[in-house]
């Protein structure tokens, strides 16, 4: 059935929950719905049905930035849950674009999430930042949502522009949330001013509602004194696996290949990833904190801090040696 038909069918059956239904019928095209009740009165039920079934649906456009491990997994989930999500919320969610660092696959009519990556490889085009932004600004939807599952500073720097043009942002990218407090407040204020959402629960805890829980406690009048936990699943996995029989950099490479690290594993090994999570959580807990107030000790040898990821792996002997001794 079309999305609009699914919406209305779902709302119809939801309104009938708990009612003394004797008989139901639905036409093959899903447009006609009939329910016979054993008892009345039905005036308020019919009024509720009309209000629910015939209210206008909002169309929400989604633009996914990043098609790596998180992005590809999100596409799988969205393909599986799209119709259910739309029926439950009454919104029509349209995957309007998939964007990586060089190319874009865009369609106002919507992309098939289950085949988006295959289409991307064949049909995505190189697009500069300005033309992409103009395309987004001209969108035909009731709302446009930017899904940032990258680790891109360039994209994080665009959040102010996204807010000013009325886009919502859902972010797994930690860089904006852990930026200096001046920039952080600017971003928050920009989204509040335009009445748009900047949601970043996915930045800490692998998608568990940790940020929400912390914020709810603060809003309830609690004072949070400390938060404890394992703040790096990557480092936890590495040190659990490491027994000296395999060079440490080989384990790092395995974790990187399996998608267990940040796109640049040096962000994990240097402590930057943990620092960003701590800053985000501390701010959610009501503390005014700067990133440089978090003390970190890096495992990355000085001569490997710059250069490419390949350079890091090719010159990791010093890291192997220091971990062998520790």
Where are these regions (language model features)?
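N-terminal glycine-/serine-/threonine-rich beta1-alpha1-beta2 phosphate-ribose binding loop
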Residues: 61-67, 71-164
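Short, small-residue-biased leader/transition segments that mark boundaries at the very start
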Residues: 2-6, 326
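Charge-rich, low-aromatic oligomerization/scaffolding segments with amphipathic character
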Residues: 10-11, 40-56
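Rossmann-fold NAD(P)-binding glycine/threonine-rich loop
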Residues: 152-164, 174-200, 206, 211-214
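Substrate-binding/catalytic subdomain of NAD(P)-dependent oxidoreductase enzymes
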Residues: 241-242, 249-325
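Rossmann-like NAD(P)H-binding beta-loop-alpha module
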Residues: 192-195, 199-258, 272, 280
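Short amphipathic alpha-helix segments
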Residues: 7-20
